A protein has these predicted regions:
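Short beta-strand edge/turn micro-motifs at domain boundaries
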Residues: 95-117
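A solvent-exposed, acidic/Ser-Thr-rich amphipathic alpha-helical stretch
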Residues: 26-78
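Hydrophobic residues embedded in beta-strands of well-ordered beta-sheets
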Residues: 37, 81-83, 107
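Short beta-strand segments that buttress and anchor functional surface loops
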Residues: 82-90
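Short beta-strand segments enriched in hydrophobic/aromatic residues
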Residues: 33-34, 89, 114
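Short, low-complexity N-terminal intrinsically disordered segments enriched in polar/charged residues
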Residues: 1-31
Length: 117
């Protein structure tokens, strides 16, 4: 296995865990981040586990059950340390994208943009 293949496998592992963690709750979701992690959104950059936890807690608290029923991944790919996700939860979110930079088994940087309905 080459170093690039190992990195791609590690990225895929973190990415898949991140997606499945939403169903398990905030503590499971936070396992993908550390104190050096940052989530960049159009509104603000959320730095470190405390701010990232607050960001996700607000997201989870604001999502009604119908949101999760409508949630659908429309595109998913990994390339080395980068993972990309496009998703929808119509009519709540017609399109959203996430890009993750994975380093040392954690999401080091994530971008998130949800396009309004």
């Amino acid at each position: 296995m080459t170093a690039s293949t190992a990195q791609a496998d590690a990225t895929t592992e973190v990415f898949d865990h991140h997606l499945s963690a939403f169903a398990k709750g905030i503590d499971e979701l936070m396992k993908d981040y550390d104190d050096g992690s940052v989530i960049v959104t159009p509104e603000k950059s959320h730095r470190g586990v405390a701010e990232i936890r607050a960001f996700f807690q607000a997201f989870l608290d604001g999502a009604e059950p119908a949101f999760w029923e409508a949630f659908k991944v429309t595109s998913k790919s990994t390339e080395g340390e980068i993972a990309y996700l496009a998703w929808e939860a119509k009519p709540f979110v017609p399109l959203a994208t996430d890009t993750l930079f994975v380093k040392n088994g954690k999401i080091a940087v994530q971008t998130f943009t949800a396009f309004p309905a």
